[in-house]
A protein has these predicted regions:
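Short linear motifs at protein or domain termini
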Residues: 1-106, 217-223
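Short, flexible turn/loop "capping" segments at secondary-structure junctions
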Residues: 37, 69-70, 137, 180-182
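Alpha-helix N-cap/N′ positions at the starts of helices
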Residues: 73, 96, 118, 180-183
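Short amphipathic alpha-helical segments with heptad-repeat character
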Residues: 87-94, 172, 201, 205
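Conserved amphipathic alpha-helical segments that form helical-bundle/coiled-coil interaction surfaces
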Residues: 108-170, 182-190, 199-209
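Hinge/beta->alpha junction and helix N-cap segments in small-molecule ligand-binding domains
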Residues: 176-177
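Short arginine-rich
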Residues: 209-219
């Protein structure tokens, strides 16, 4: 069972609803709750220290993100992503990120290009000391999508973010995958710096293909 320390909501200026949602989402992504595990409202109220209404609102949002699902006569459970689910998600991710890389070359400002390179340097430093690069990679992709200038594309990617991040966490847990992932990000930056939009798109798609293969291996190891 997840500890109260993980989920406890602090009394800060941030809205309670946002804190509950963030804490529950992170607990799922960090696998404090196992896929298929039932989430009991009463227990979540005790762990977080918030009202049942706040818990229900958070669970509805997590359902919209695809992280939990409601099963008749059982209640809310943590979603289980199968290898087929992952394959379909990464097909879509390949299209989205390939286009994002292309549009970044075509539309990004010099400041956005510098920001992307700076973020990769941050990822390098984290990887060098075997620290988690998940959040730093999230920021890298944010810069990439924003720099492309297509709001609809960014919104579509954001709608899949929670499920993809859960799978990314799995893939990066494989020995050697984090360093290979960082090397692939360098390939993306190199392609962007070349000014070749199609080359950047290919580098992004290649990175997603390799990540997808890693996810499949990670899911197979869990079964």
């Amino acid at each position: 069972m997840v500890s109260a320390e993980v989920l406890r909501v602090e009394r800060t200026p941030a809205p309670i609803r946002a804190q509950v949602l963030d804490n529950l989402r992170q607990a799922i992504l960090d696998r404090h709750f196992a896929p298929g595990q039932r989430l009991i409202e009463r227990e979540l109220v005790e762990l977080t220290g918030v009202s049942r209404t706040s818990i229900r609102e958070a669970l509805r949002e997590l359902a919209a993100e695809g992280l939990v699902t409601t099963i008749p006569n059982k209640g809310t459970v943590v979603a289980t992503l199968s290898a087929e689910d992952a394959r379909q998600l990464y097909q879509v991710r390949s299209v989205l990120e390939g286009l994002a890389g292309k549009l970044f070359v075509e539309n990004a400002s010099p400041a956005q290009r510098r920001a992307l390179a700076k973020q990769l340097a941050t990822i390098d430093r984290l990887a060098a000391r075997d620290a988690s690069i998940l959040e730093a990679k999230d920021r890298f992709y944010d810069i990439l999508f924003v720099g492309g200038g297509n709001v609809a594309l960014h919104q579509t990617a954001a709608s899949l973010h929670a499920r993809i991040r859960a799978l990314r966490s799995l893939s990066l847990s494989l020995p050697g995958r984090a360093r290979k992932s960082v090397a692939e990000l360098h390939d993306i930056i190199e392609a962007i710096d070349s000014g070749d939009a199609e080359k950047a798109a290919r580098a992004c798609r290649r990175h997603v293909a390799n990540a997808g293969a890693a996810v499949t291996r990670a899911l197979s190891a869990l079964t």
